[in-house]
């Protein structure tokens, strides 16, 4: 227990100056609407702000219609069989063993349905996997249990911890000190477990390429509002891309079980105007230039 307290205090001492400096940089971004986050009693996707997210929502709605029609059809058939062919209504059961036309139909029709679905789903999949040339390239490294980011074209690197994690002086619980940190960073109390002490900052309407890897175990970098999710596998470098169409703050979380603090590994992305991004980047280069702390200590291979 004493060792854990010592490690937590050491992490706080090392991380605090960086966290406050990063907050000062982000304070120049102005007020941003908090768009991409879970909603109480929400039953659908988060509001999508990328073409990828819109495509996924459209595909999901189309599949819902198809599945609903199939389910209703099957339930009607079951109801007919129950009513017309129960023991009381049909005292003399049929003796035939097969019906060739029906068997052909229930084989061919599902094949046609799957081909129809594939004709629309495969283009969505390919669009996600075909990585365009990025206006901004950011390397993401998953650690137990925080994220490291490196703007590879500018040698700017920083680490991102959940507000309330031991590295920020917390113990993964919401208390008065954590409430104060959330308020100082511009977050609300219900954004605890989502907000981080440092955020990824990207320009609006620009192609962002994220190069994702892991330093210890498998993690997964996910932003629902962007329609992106990529596993962070140690020893491999995978890519995803997005182009956010609306300024705001967007939240995500690690989506691959990675240990006891998996639930405390959120992601915060701030989408800002190009002018605000350039100003933030210039300040970040001055503050962190030449210090890409998120570089893992091993070679990675493209997959």
Where in the sequence are the language-model features?
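Hydrophobic alpha-helical transmembrane segments
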Residues: 65-79
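Non-transmembrane, membrane-proximal soluble domains of secreted or membrane proteins
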Residues: 23-62, 85-303
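N-terminal secretory/membrane targeting signals
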Residues: 1-24
């Amino acid at each position: 227990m004493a060792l854990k307290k010592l490690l937590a205090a050491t992490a706080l001492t090392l991380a605090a100056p960086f966290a406050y400096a990063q907050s000062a940089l982000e304070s120049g971004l102005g007020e941003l609407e908090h768009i991409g986050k879970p909603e109480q009693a929400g039953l659908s996707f988060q509001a999508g702000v990328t073409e990828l997210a819109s495509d996924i929502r459209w595909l999901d709605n189309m599949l819902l219609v198809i599945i609903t029609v199939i389910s209703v059809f099957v339930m009607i058939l079951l109801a007919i069989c129950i009513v017309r062919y129960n023991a009381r209504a049909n005292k003399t059961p049929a003796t035939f063993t097969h019906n060739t036309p029906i068997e052909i139909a229930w084989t061919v029709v599902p094949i046609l349905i799957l081909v129809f679905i594939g004709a629309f789903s495969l283009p969505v999949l390919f669009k996600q996997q075909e990585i365009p040339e990025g206006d901004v390239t950011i390397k993401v490294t998953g650690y137990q249990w925080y994220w490291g980011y490196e703007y590879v074209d500018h040698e700017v690197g920083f680490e991102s911890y959940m507000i309330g994690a031991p590295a920020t002086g917390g113990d993964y619980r919401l208390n008065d000190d954590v409430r104060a940190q959330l308020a100082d960073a511009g977050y609300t109390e219900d954004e605890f477990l989502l907000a981080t002490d440092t955020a990824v900052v990207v320009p609006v309407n620009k192609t962002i390429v994220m190069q994702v890897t892991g330093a210890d175990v498998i993690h997964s970098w996910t932003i629902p509002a962007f329609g992106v999710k990529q596993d962070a596998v140690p020893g491999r470098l995978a890519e995803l891309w997005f182009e956010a169409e609306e300024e705001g703050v967007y939240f995500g979380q690690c989506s691959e079980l990675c240990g006891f603090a998996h639930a405390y590994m959120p992601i915060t992305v701030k989408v800002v105007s190009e002018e605000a991004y350039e100003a933030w980047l210039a300040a970040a280069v001055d503050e962190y230039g030449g210090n890409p702390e998120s570089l893992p200590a091993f070679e990675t291979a493209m997959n």
